[in-house]
Amino acid sequence: MSATPSETTTERNFFVHPQALVESTEIGRNTRVWAFAHVMRGARVGADCNIGDHAFIESGAILGNNVTVKNGVAIWDRVTIEDNVFLGPNCVLTNDLNPRAYIKKSGSTLVPTLIRENATIGANVTIVCGVTIGQYAFIGAGAVVIRSVPDFALIVGNPGRQIGWMCVCAEKLPLPAGAARDSSVTCPHCRRSFVVAPGGLSVVEEVLIGKGENQ
């Protein structure tokens, strides 16, 4: 995966609602931008993304492929969203830890945030800048994330705290948040197997989606 869009469009091969504003020339194939959304020049959006009503994507923001941006989400400069990420309605991303209206910041003075591939960010979540959200992590609605999140972790509350782990299939795993390293678990829904590793869970046995068979 790369958060760099797969295509730079020289002709329109994506959809823009008549009441949306798209100034960027880097929008991937089959992406859809809906009413009152604004994508600024210098933003990079991959293929097959869905940008909901009233979303805002600032110059310098990067979205990978197949990203879902629900209504009212704002994505700022120095925020990178990898492939297959879901951003729920009105979730909030930031890029300045100590803002003042009279202090203007840009570029390297802003704080980067990375949301890794396949993560889910619930409605009304706030993500304080400077963190990494791990792959397949699941941030519950209304949570406030103030530190980096491991792969597959389930986070809820204010401040956000880990209460468990989520499977690739988006079901909660029967494994406590504080499970020791090398602890293992199998998802009762899809039969994928995982082990606790540095940085979160690691898949040790994959399945064929929809068939429940080992590869």
Protein language model annotation of sequence segments:
Residues C167, C187-C190:
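Short cysteine-rich clusters marking metal-coordination/redox-active sites
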Residues V149, L201-Q215:
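Short, intrinsically disordered terminal segments enriched in charged and Pro/Gly residues
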Residues L175-P176, V195-A197:
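Short, non-ligating residues that shape and space the ligands of small metal-coordination modules
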Residues I139, G157:
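Conserved G/P- and acidic residue-centered "switch" motifs that form tight phosphate/ATP-binding loops
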Residues A3-P18, E23-I27, R32-T132, A153, ...:
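Flexible, glycine/small-residue-enriched loop-and-beta-strand segment within the central core
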Residues P176-S184:
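Short linker/helix segments within small regulatory modules
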